[in-house]
Amino acid sequence: MPAVWPPRTVIRKSSGLRTLESALYRAGLGPVAGVDEVGRGACAGPLVVAACILGPNRLESLSALDDSKKLNESERERLFPLIRRYAVAFHVVFIPSVEVDRRGVHVANIEGMRRAVAGLAVRPGYVLSDGFRVPGLPMPSLPVVGGDAAAACIAAASVLAKVSRDRLMVAMDQEHPGYGFADHKGYSTRAHSAALNDLGPSTQHRFSFINVRRLVVDGEPGQGGELECGKLAVDVPVDMPVDRVLREGQLSR
């Protein structure tokens, strides 16, 4: 029986992004998958969750990996194809805003993490998640506080999720003009709030968020028309048209 790991751990950044993964591989618990999400705090657009396995060896091509929120856009875009090329396996899940409303952000996030791990072409022996415990996984897992800045596989998942969501929000800006999705990516900013006040919510907004819900008149959304019901978690490629996001496809390897 492998050693029982603590229920939650903090890894110092100075110890290196591969320290925890290397320890797990040495203990015979690999392959090690990292899982992370982006879009929890946005009031529009999907919640995006990615899982990624990098393998036991350090790759110089991915030496710039860091928490995707600390990398600038050009650095994330440069790393995105490299991660897809060198990863042993990865899988990205998009959870539509209507399901975030229906299930709640936390429940949708945990379900998305399970789906992302289940979608990996290589079954991991261990899963590292960024901060959140993920119940229901068929393999041992460990939530790591600040994991996207402490474990390379989580950092890679963070970049995959962030770039995938950002690209989708840019495309969504074309289908729902006026909100500025390409700029703020669905997060609450002064410009986004002003657009919401002028246009009302679209079908891509999260009606469970108070700043959106207060603008709904008689339960009807604004510019976007009727709310569309989607599946709980739909896996889509980053270049798929937004009108197909809720229905089909996948981004994985």
UniProtKB/Swiss-Prot annotation:
One of its GO terms (cellular component) is cytoplasm. Manganese or magnesium. Binds 1 divalent metal ion per monomer in the absence of substrate. May bind a second metal ion after substrate binding. Pfam families: RNase_HII. A divalent metal cation binds at residues 36-37, 130. InterPro entries: RNase_HII, RNase_HII/HIII, RNase_HII/HIII_dom, RNaseH-like_sf, RNaseH_sf. Its main location: cytoplasm. This is Ribonuclease HII. It catalyses: Endonucleolytic cleavage to 5'-phosphomonoester. One of its GO terms (molecular function) is RNA-DNA hybrid ribonuclease activity. PROSITE patterns: RNASE_H_2. The gene is rnhB. Its cofactor is Mn(2+); Mg(2+). PANTHER family: RIBONUCLEASE H2 SUBUNIT A, RIBONUCLEASE HII. Keywords: Cytoplasm, Endonuclease, Hydrolase, Manganese, Metal-binding, Nuclease. Its EC number is 3.1.26.4. Belongs to the RNase HII family. Signal peptide: none annotated. GO terms for biological process: DNA replication, removal of RNA primer; mismatch repair. Residues 30-221 form the RNase H type-2 domain. Endonuclease that specifically degrades the RNA of RNA-DNA hybrids. The lineage of its organism: Bacteria, Bacillati, Actinomycetota, Actinomycetes, Mycobacteriales.
